[in-house]
Structure formats: C-alpha cells, structure tokens
Amino acid sequence: MKQVFLESHNLKNRFSGFGQFNYHLIKAMAHFPQDEFEIVLNAKNTSALKEEFGDTFKYRKYSSLTRHKPFRIKKKYNLWHCLNQNIKIEPFFNIPYLLTVHDVHFVKENSVEMQEKLKKQFKEKLQRSSAITYISEFAKQDTHAHFKVPDVPEYVIYNGNTITDITVPEDFKPSILPPKQYLFSIGDFSERKNFMSLVEMLRFLPEYNLVLAGNNTSSYAQKLTALVSQYGFKNRVFQTGKIADLKKQYYLKNCDAFVFPSHREGFGIPPIEAMRFGKPVFLSNNTSLPEIGGEHSFYWNNYNPEYMASQLKSGMEKFNNNKAFYQNWYTDRAKSFNWKNTAEKYLEVYKSLI
C-alpha cells in the first residue's frame, strides 16, 4: 500500500504551536481511516501514540541524526508532508513533497546571519515542493511577497479550534487566581507576542488584573517581570508559566476579555479558543489576525498604552450592551474552525499527489 510520511517530530512538545498543530491534525485524521494509503508518523514517543491511535497509523521512531544530510531518511515514501517551514529533517531522495507554511516571520526576526541561513533553508523547501499549503491567506501572501514560489498547486487550509467541548468542573480552581476581574493572554514570552504592552496598558485600567500564561523563561520574560516590579503590579500581573488544557479553559471561561497584542501571527489559535467561550477578543490589527478574528473582534492599530486602554474600555462597553449578539457570534465563529474539516482537506491534497 502507498504511504504518506508525516514529519511530525514536533509532537514531542505539545505546549508549542507546532506541537499543537501536529497533534490536533493527526487526531482529526484518525477519524478518516484510509483504504488508499497508510499514514506514517515520525515521533520520539511512538508508544504513547500507539496507545492512543492503535493501528490507525504506522509509526517511525524519530532520531535527531536524520536532521543531518548524510543520515536523511532513505525510504522512498509516496508522499512526504513537511508540517512546518522550520523543519530540518528532509528526505534523502527527491520524492513527492507537500510543504505546510505557517509563517515566514524569520525574514524580519533574528540576526542578519540567521535570517540568511533560514531563507536559504526555506528556498530549498520551496524548490522541493510538489504542492504547498498555507494556514492563512496572509501566510500565503507574505510568502509570495518575500520569495519566488514555484508553479505548483497551492491551498489555504485553516487550522481548527483546539477547544470544542468546555470541560471545567464547577469546583476546579487553579493555584494562581487573581482577586478581581482579569484579562487573559497566552503564548511564549517573546518580543513577537508583545505582552509588555499589556502591562503598560494596565496603568490606565485600575479595575483589571492580568493573567499571562506560557513559557516565561526567556530574557523577554525577565524584562516583563522587571516592568511589573517597576510599576508595583506584583499583585495585579500573574504569570502562570506553561499550563495544561484544564487551567487554560478555566482562565478563558472566567476572564473578562482575551487580549492578544501580537506583532506577527501566521494564524492565531488562542483568539478562536477564547471565542469558544463567547469572550470579547482584542487583537492587533495586523498580519493574519483580522482574517482570523473577523469583523466583530476588537482591534488595536497601535500600542500606545492609553489608546489601548481606551479601545478596551469602549470595546467592553459595546460587548456588554449587546452581549447576546456578541457571544453567539463568537461561539459560531469558533465552531467554524474545525479540525475534522482541516484534516479532510489535507487528506484530499494527499490523494491529489500520490
């Protein structure tokens, strides 16, 4: 039987965006057993995957050695799916190759030397590609703006919403709990996510606390913590670190609003997770966020803290004055991003390439 190889080693970090993408795509694909081909997963912990998915998939044990050219995987699969633009693991031979592009933010980030290295790596991926999928229209447009894209089939396939069912027990309480109403955001603590602008904004929102979830071990996190101390906000800004789904759902369910002032996104799953709870969503008006947020989310055009606070206050007033409409719109929009639909579209692309 024909085989489709999914380069899915990012499953090893479920807290990362790529890890989430890999896991939820594969989980959704499990609902569509294939007669025409087998799907092979490349993963470090194959036993956990076998326990969850059984013989729905085939499995290959990931080895970091395969990142290096002499040790590349030599099996000639009928299709190789590279699940993101940053992966260093490539097939040894020239075989049918599907590339999924989440973003090309690397053209604006990192040192000049690193930018050139990543551009070279990405150009090689483009030249390998038999087809390309993008997770948003913005990701496609941005790729075309910075690179010569080969004349191959291209598809925009949106990610799904990772939260479909709300499963927070009534008696559950996380260990970190603000004493009054709060705003919530989640993501890596990095310049790109721009969490410090939220701390600055709090100076003009004395009625709110702020909960920030995500990997907070970076140098940016240290700067943010210093800013919190500078303003005397230790009892107003709460950093949870990485959190599991239950805690994330709790904070989304109980926050007053979800705030996401990111500088750059290829898609933006956290906002649609917040929408599932009918929460007002405040986003940067840039990159993919207006595309994903839609017409009834609220947007910041700049990061002046007083302006951001004013936009939040006026947005909250609009939301509260027409709460039923906004809650219904948000939950409907969240449900429109469905991993089963996403998986079905990828499987159709596979069929077209093998």
Q: Where in the sequence are the language-model features?
A:
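Carbohydrate transferase catalytic cores enriched for Leloir-type hexosyltransferases
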Residues: M1-I354
